[in-house]
Amino acid sequence: MKELKRDLLTTKYTKVLVEENYQFNAPHRYEVVTNEPGCYPDTLAKIHFQEGPIKECGVNGVCNEDLINMVIDRLEHFQQSEFACRENAIAITKLEEALLWLRKRTIAREQRGVEGTHSV
């Protein structure tokens, strides 16, 4: 595992680790660990994404949409509290937009008869 580096990813409290060796064009395993100076990192979460097409490999991990929906749910709960804010509302909208584009991709693959397979 190596540390994930992204422009907007903060490492103030946690670090995200990503597998280095993977198949099917993208990493499948991620970990979120504590990032406290002088302390050994504790694993807070392990995420295992789907490895390979479902029709060929079966369901063996979470999909992108699962995690996006979790974040939307969490932000919607904040929006029902004293922590409601414009930034959360915009983030929800953008995450919902991401779900729309991912759904559009799936629909297009279904129409071509290749959804759930390794075919393009």
PLM feature segments, named:
Residues 21-23, 38-40, 86, 91-92:
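Residue-level signal for the start and early helices of compact helical domains
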Residues 2-5, 12-15, 46, 55, ...:
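Context-gated lysine
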Residues 14, 30, 43-47, 84, ...:
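Aromatic-residue detector
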Residues 28-78:
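A short, structured beta-strand/loop element
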Residues 73, 78-113:
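Short, compact, well-ordered microdomains
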Residues 4, 17-19, 59, 101-120:
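Signature of extracytoplasmic/envelope-associated structural regions
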Residues 1-36:
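Short, charged/polar N-terminal "headpieces" of proteins
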